[in-house]
Amino acid sequence: MELKNKKWTDEEFFKQREEVLKQWPTGKEVDLQEAVDYLKKVPTEKNFADKLVRAKEAGITLAQPRAGVALLDEHINLLRYLQDEGGADLLPSTIDAYTRQNRYEECEIGIKESEKAGRSLLNGFPGVNHGVKGCRKVLESVNLPLQARHGTPDSRLLAEIIHAGGWTSNEGGGISYNIPYAKSVPIDKCLKDWQYCDRLVGFYEEQGVHINREPFGPLTGTLVPPSMSNAVGITEALLAAEQGVKNITVGYGECGNMLQDIAALRCLEEQTNEYLKAYGYNDVFVTTVFHQWMGGFPQDESKAFGVIVTATTIASLAGATKVIVKTPHEAIGIPTKEANASGIKATKMALNMLEGQRMPMSKELETEMAIIKAETKCILDKMFELGKGDLAVGTVKAFETGVMDIPFGPSKYNAGKMMPVRDNLGCVRYLEFGNVPFTEELKNYNRERLAERAKFEGREVSFQMVIDDIFAVGKGRLIGRPENK
């Protein structure tokens, strides 16, 4: 099937669906009409899309952790703990690494080995292997909406199972769950596989079942300039809307400068709505998610809480609908349930104290928003041009030409010629533009900001700054300064 940004026909969708459900025996558990009936009985307080709509209308920010273990009962106990003790507003099920690579036989071994060991030997919840019945048991054991969070380039079977299991949100997209996660997955294949996931959600919407879709905003989580991550989020929102998705949460990963982060999140929401309306998608409800710091964390727990609360402050002042919570064990590895709950509690405390407060518009905020919007528009305009009006085709060509270029992405289809670095205030700017199609005016703005840092630090603008910035937060500060600064 040729890639194009056009809603799949029922015939195209159901033909491919026959093959998808054969990928693992639990695919047989999915009966679409029965799933529609089941989902219609899910109470609204456990529907992810509905809860996001209510939160946005109320002007509050919801807190959602990451969490997932191999065994069903242990996973349920973990989620209940984060719900009851942590006070989470929304629940995740972080999916294990084997499922992300469609290696279900190894998942099965991991489940059996976990049972023998009496603890999880997988780094997440193997949703496909637990099947529709297992996913429903999880949903029926908690009081909050559930979302699958993963990193799967081919999420088709996983999407079928989790949605039939009553989970009303799926994270990911054809760019954001490929370029940062995989080395050798062709971009056109991944885009088609995610068109399937979106078409599935579109089918449910046609039956009156509301399901949320969330592009993964932080990408590689390492110094991603806001305009690049925003361009990805807007692209994935447009591709999802074409397949019939009506409830979309666009995401952004904290860069660290409060003003830039607030500007970026507001630009993301505004431009997503602008582009959706410009292309005729007038009935899509857009919300935002802010990811707490995705880079290296300090090992000291008290310092880690400082990072968590700073991020929460930014999310709240930006007006995010949701914040993804980190834990004080981030630098060490997979957190205990207690550490995970403590991250949620710290986040919720900050959200409660800041409820209703927003960063007011200022000259500086206005300038930053104008820059981000202009840069984002340059990227998106070129993508539409490359695809001759077709954004899916334009996405493939944008990666081929380096117009879209994700810093530090492992994919061999990513140019890797663009290089980011912080300016003197900690904003993430473009050090090397590669083939990112900015105007000379925008390029000069980036260069001027970096020259200010070079002057302050008494050194040349160079790749050493990038290295210093990558490790800075783990060492206790935002900007990677030389020792004498």
Curated annotation (Swiss-Prot):
It is an enzyme of class 5 (isomerase). Gene3D superfamilies: 3.90.970.10, Methylmalonyl-CoA mutase (3.20.20.240). Keywords: Cobalamin, Cobalt, Isomerase. It comes from the Bacteria. It holds the Pfam family Met_asp_mut_E. Pathway: Amino-acid degradation; L-glutamate degradation via mesaconate pathway; acetate and pyruvate from L-glutamate: step 1/4. Its EC number is 5.4.99.1. Heterotetramer composed of 2 epsilon subunits (GlmE) and 2 sigma subunits (GlmS). GlmE exists as a homodimer and GlmS as a monomer. NCBIfam families: MthylAspMut_E. Catalyzes the carbon skeleton rearrangement of L-glutamate to L-threo-3-methylaspartate ((2S,3S)-3-methylaspartate). This is Glutamate mutase epsilon subunit. It comes from Clostridium tetanomorphum.
